From Swiss-Prot:
Residue sites binding Zn(2+) per the record: 167-168, 171, 183
Protein name: Ubiquinone biosynthesis protein coq4, mitochondrial
Quaternary state and interactors: Component of a multi-subunit COQ enzyme complex, composed of at least coq3, coq4, coq5, coq6, coq7 and coq9.
Taxonomic source organism: Talaromyces stipitatus (strain ATCC 10500 / CBS 375.48 / QM 6759 / NRRL 1006)
Gene: coq4
PANTHER family listed in its UniProt record: UBIQUINONE BIOSYNTHESIS PROTEIN (PTHR12922), UBIQUINONE BIOSYNTHESIS PROTEIN COQ4 HOMOLOG, MITOCHONDRIAL (PTHR12922:SF7)
GO cellular component: extrinsic component of mitochondrial inner membrane
Function, in words: Lyase that catalyzes the C1-decarboxylation of 4-hydroxy-3-methoxy-5-(all-trans-polyprenyl)benzoic acid into 2-methoxy-6-(all-trans-polyprenyl)phenol during ubiquinone biosynthesis.
Record-linked InterPro entries: Coq4, Coq4_euk
Length: 287
């Protein structure tokens, strides 16, 4: 049964309250731009509060102007995830036996570790085959994810990296494409599941949709995102490497994710309707 509005509000409020309580325990380190502490891990760039704020604002505006600037979206995610939200996500992993194993093992999702040729050989409806087919159809690679730079805590940096590398699995099990409309639907789902601010802020890109796309998003995909995002398990705790041979429908049901409206099929049907309407108009005008 889908959550009631009151239950949904309480769920989000509780997750945000957890973020606030965690934030009372963790604060930004104070230092100047001329006296930076040493990096906590390879590639780490310590930022002052002002620098973090400027990075958040600049990357937010830049990614709104060009939603395909994945580097800006990544920077926005890191700049707004601390000090509260990334710790909540880390603690969600610590509260789960599988999440703790992931934190201990530190697996990485790359084309080498996933062995894409093997995934393509798996049964048709398996998680691995579905994931590989989605990568091939969308023309993307698991190796394109940016490395985390701006999160100070080394363990939390891995949590953000893990979330980032799992994003394509979320696409695959839901079937949502990488077009703006599909990304917005997935980001809305991720926001309610992870409470990472960047995923919620990304919804501002809805202003870039065409009127028909925007109406479809708010009527179909946003309600789906709310239902599934609030009722599903914490996806950060899925050990995807161990699920590759499972049936994707069974896993989706186990995680509490409702299959979203098929965006590609909807767009295909609309194109056909527009084509028929145009042909009828041409016949009526005698052309």
């Amino acid at each position: 049964m889908p959550p009631t509005p009151r239950t949904a509000l309480l769920t989000v409020s509780n997750r945000c309250l957890q973020c606030h309580e965690i934030g009372l325990k963790y604060s930004f380190r104070s230092f100047s731009a001329l006296n930076r502490p040493p990096p906590s891990y390879p590639g780490h760039v310590p930022l002052t509060r002002i620098e973090r704020g400027v990075l958040a604002i600049g990357s937010a505006f830049g990614s709104l102007l060009n939603p395909r600037r994945h580097d800006l979206i990544a920077a926005l995610g890191e700049a707004t995830a601390t000090p509260y939200f990334i710790y909540r996500l880390r603690d969600a992993m610590l509260s789960s036996p599988t999440g703790r194993r992931i934190l201990r093992d530190r697996p990485r999702l790359t084309s080498e570790t996933l062995k894409l040729p093997y995934l393509r050989s798996l049964p048709e409806n398996s998680v691995g085959r579905t994931y590989a087919k989605w990568l091939d159809r969308e023309g993307v690679s698991p190796d394109t994810r940016d490395s985390v730079q701006y999160i100070d805590d080394e363990e939390c940096a891995y949590v953000m990296q893990r979330y980032r590398e799992c994003h394509d699995f979320y696409h695959a099990v839901t079937g949502l494409p990488t077009m703006v409309e599909g990304e917005l639907a997935l980001k809305a789902f991720e926001f309610l599941n992870t409470v990472i601010p960047m995923t919620g802020l990304s919804l501002a890109a809805a202003i870039r949709l065409k009127p028909a796309e925007r109406e479809r998003f708010f009527k179909l995909h946003l309600p789906w995102a709310v239902r599934s995002g609030l009722s599903s398990e914490e996806l950060i705790n899925v050990y995807w490497e161990e699920q590759l041979e499972r049936n994707v429908d069974e896993l989706r049901a186990e995680l509490g994710i409702e299959a979203p409206p098929d965006l590609r099929e909807i767009r295909r049907m609309m194109r056909q309707q527009e084509k028929r309407a145009k042909e009828q108009q041409m016949k009526a005008s005698g052309l």
